[in-house]
């Protein structure tokens, strides 16, 4: 981790685009970002409806790359710290990892399928929930940093064109 600045972006695609442009050649580390977060972020950057993308991924259980070829226009190098069993491809969720690492599990009282705009209090609670998830993702990453370094080392061994 070379950059340690927190960015809280709420309903501001221009600010998200500026963050993406400033970091687009970097490695984006996350928990399940390969299958979820990158598609939500790319969709917002492309002016798509993130709720429709979310439902495609979660409700319909479809792959993000199937939603739109336009996602390919936005390069994003992802490193996903979500562990999976190589034989069964079953994944381990972040809350399970938090238990394994001895962390407190934080949940939110804000209903994810709410049909109205969030109140200011609900937004603050959601930011707190997301911040905790990011902190736990960093903790998982630091536990697996040797794996990241090995993968990064292999990639660096190949010449760039």
Annotate each language-model stretch with its function.
Residues 2-96:
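Conserved DEDDh/DEDDy metal-dependent 3′-5′ exonuclease domain
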Residues 29, 84-161:
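Acidic, Mg2+-coordinating catalytic module of metal-dependent nucleases/exonucleases
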């Amino acid at each position: 981790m070379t950059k340690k600045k927190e960015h809280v972006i709420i309903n501001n695609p221009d600010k998200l685009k500026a963050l993406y442009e400033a970091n687009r050649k970097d490695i984006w580390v996350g928990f399940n970002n390969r299958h979820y977060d990158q598609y939500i972020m790319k969709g917002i950057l492309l002016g798509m409806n993130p709720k429709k993308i979310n439902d495609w991924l979660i409700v319909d259980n479809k792959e993000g790359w199937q939603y739109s070829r336009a996602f390919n226009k936005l390069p994003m190098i992802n490193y996903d710290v979500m562990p999976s069993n190589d034989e069964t491809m079953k994944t381990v969720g972040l809350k399970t990892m938090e238990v394994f690492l001895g962390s407190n599990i934080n949940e939110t009282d804000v209903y994810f399928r709410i049909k109205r705009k969030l109140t200011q209090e609900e937004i603050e609670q959601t930011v707190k929930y997301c911040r905790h998830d990011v902190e736990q993702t960093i903790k998982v990453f630091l536990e697996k940093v040797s794996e990241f370094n090995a993968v990064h080392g292999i990639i660096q061994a190949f010449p760039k064109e």
